[in-house]
Amino acid sequence: MITQLPDDFRFGGPEMQLCTLAIRIADLAERFGFTLIHYDDDGLGRAASMFVRLESGRALLLTEHAHAVEHLGSKGPVVEVDARDIAEIDVEPFVDEVLEAFQLSRADVDWIAPIDKARALDWIRHWADYFAKRDQAGNAERLK
């Protein structure tokens, strides 16, 4: 079962793009009774998003930009996930989990991220190093 998360949900780790769906986000929201967040995304125009949780507990952020659909050939939302989940199960099984949850097939996928567990782990390490250095620098400033 798939459930909607609050609009203020945030991933615990770094975000990574998993795939792009070839079905409109409004259709998915209507099918599952979810509410979309509509907003202006700085520099990218009008967007619609929703956070959902899969039965496994993994969270997704689906975002669709009107400009991308109207002018760039985008067919549906980008699916972003916590990189730690890709590192755990890899891209292809994760895409399959998303498709099963939304009752979609591979024909409903426009693009799959060309990454693997190792790349996700590298991104997680980079992300963790950045925050450790930032926090360390912040603590040094406070000690002066």
Where are these regions (language model features)?
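Amphipathic, interaction-prone secondary-structure segments
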Residues: 34-65
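Generic structural motif
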Residues: 2-4, 36, 106-112
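Amphipathic alpha-helical segments
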Residues: 18-38
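Catalytic phosphate/metal-binding cores of nucleic-acid and nucleotide-processing enzymes, i.e., regions
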Residues: 8-12, 34, 68
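Non-cytosolic coordination micro-motifs
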Residues: 69-144
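Hydrophobic beta-strand residues in large extracellular and virion-surface proteins
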Residues: 28, 50-52, 60-62, 79-81, ...
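N-terminal trafficking/processing presequences and adjacent post-cleavage segments
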Residues: 1-23
